[in-house]
Amino acid sequence: IVTSLGVLTAVATLLSGGVTTAYANDALANPNSAMGYPSFKGAADPIPGTGVAFDPSTSYLKQVFDADVANGAGTDTAHDFWIDKMLTRTGTAPNGTGTNDAGDYNYAGADKNEYLFSRGRAAFMYTHTPEALGFVGDVAYWDQTGNDGFTVEVSIGGSKQTLRENTDKRKQTPSYFTTEFTNGDKTITVTEVKYITYTNVMVANFTITSTTGGDVTLTAASPFAQDGNDGDTELTGRFNVKNDLTTIYPRFSGNGFTVKDGKLASTLTLEANVPQTTKLQLGLIANELPDSTAEYEARFNGDLTDPAASYKDSVTTYNQWWVDNIPYVETQEHNIDKTVFYRWWLSRFNMLDANMPGNTFQYPTSIEGVLGYNNQIVLTSGMFINDTKWFRNAEYSYGTWVSAGQTAKKGQSGYYYYHDNPGDPANWNHSYTQYITKAGWDSYKVHGGPSSLAEALGDYGSEDVKGLLNSQSEPDSNDNQNSNGNKLIDWSWWSMTGNDADAVSFSEPGRSGQRMDRADGSANMWANANAAAQAYKAAGDTEKAAEMQQIADAIKQDVLDNLWDSDSKLLLHKWLNDGQFAKYKDLNNYYPYADRQ
């Protein structure tokens, strides 16, 4: 947990490989086991049974997956894969009300199970309106488009039906979403199952039942695809995504649907109480992702036209990814285990793998909050790398630090320092505190690779550290991080720490806007410099390794010489204008103790 927060330098072990120095303050330590477990609420056992005995000699997740397939997983929404079952949400929970150890609570920001978990490599729902048929809300292709995916109307005898969602039928797993609708007199029931395939095809299956029988017409429209002649079997379009990072070529079709007036229409003849199933698919096709065409065409006129086959292919592919990529984790507390799997899902959900042209998102890249800031923000990149380095496919962790290195900003000094991805300069276009090189080096120690890759990591880290140490005249004052020319990072704004208003050390009365040498940013910079030295050493570049180690040692010495307060026996931030230590302490004062290298 500590290394996820920040990083870096253990003052107590900084100087001599574990030997306590004069800078350290002896203190009592309590074992973590003394803390006990928190009080958990919810399901009595949050981990569903697998029916599979654990065998450490083989892949447990593969055994569970195979058992799921044998038991019909993927054939319908009543037969789920194990991780889908574990992370299922039903109804409109969480609704923001409940009781915990502190009493009753009411949280107005609860999501009510409305966000769509299913996503593709680049496509997802930034906002989602589940009470409407289709993909209604703000579709994102890497970021918001401002458009619905597609809408669907149901008509009987030319009369549009008003459908109401039965929210108690709402069910969501990471791989699909399903719910049920009825019309006013309850003569029509529509069960919807929707999902986004790996390569960005948005599919909705509709099972329609009529208590009376007769013709039911479905009319579907998509702002992405409106070109086509009446009688055609698909609509097409062209769309430049946000900031013109790429162009997609949407294709829209459905089983038995034909074009009429720029929309798709299909009339089903139903027998009373005999359900019929059909489907619609919107492919967000990108030239740089040729599989997006293949996945769409398989559902348009290929071997996945059948709704059940399309669904099974998508959810099976989704769940196979877990087997291929994540390690199995089990503790003595199943509530913790579920949190671990949920965290794996978060790492996956917040991954953009768009293979875009240009120098923005050409690599798989972890994104800070695809439903929020939605950019590769350097502040959190290290945290994501620390998690994704455990994925078996190295591209997920390597992609993030390679992307940061390739999109680094050239400073006035001529060095390139890590900077928020230029694909979305609105969020936030700064160089916040970060430990990307350190996290990248940790990922390299897990996965390895050619010496050229280690050399590249060393180069990225070297440029970043030198760029920050020489940042005195950047156009954006927030990117000036060493105003006094020493070996310490200085800031005047709490957001640079990532803790925002929780970085209370900035809040001394009369000190607003003043700069201080920081223990946290300097510790992170030391970690990056030290990691760059280690990467160069692994690459066999001893000259550059020695140079970066010298810089790392100089940073360490400046931290100890300038930020150690012998009275409080703690590293404190220090104001530049008068050399006084900051009066207020915060979590960030402890960053230098957080990692023992």
Residue ranges with predicted function:
Residues 273, 277, 281-304, 369-370, ...:
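The feature captures the catalytic groove of carbohydrate-active enzymes
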Residues 202, 209-220, 535, 547-550, ...:
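Beta-rich accessory regions
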Residues 311-455, 459-463, 572-597:
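Substrate-binding groove/exosite segments of carbohydrate-active enzymes
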Residues 137, 142-150, 175-177, 400, ...:
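Amphipathic, well-ordered alpha-helical segments in soluble domains
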Residues 1-11:
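Sec-dependent N-terminal signal peptides
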Residues 14-26:
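Sec-dependent signal peptide cleavage junction
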Residues 334-356, 388-391, 395, 409-413, ...:
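Active-site acid/base region of carbohydrate-active enzymes
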Residues 23-334:
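Terminal accessory carbohydrate-recognition/targeting modules of carbohydrate-active enzymes
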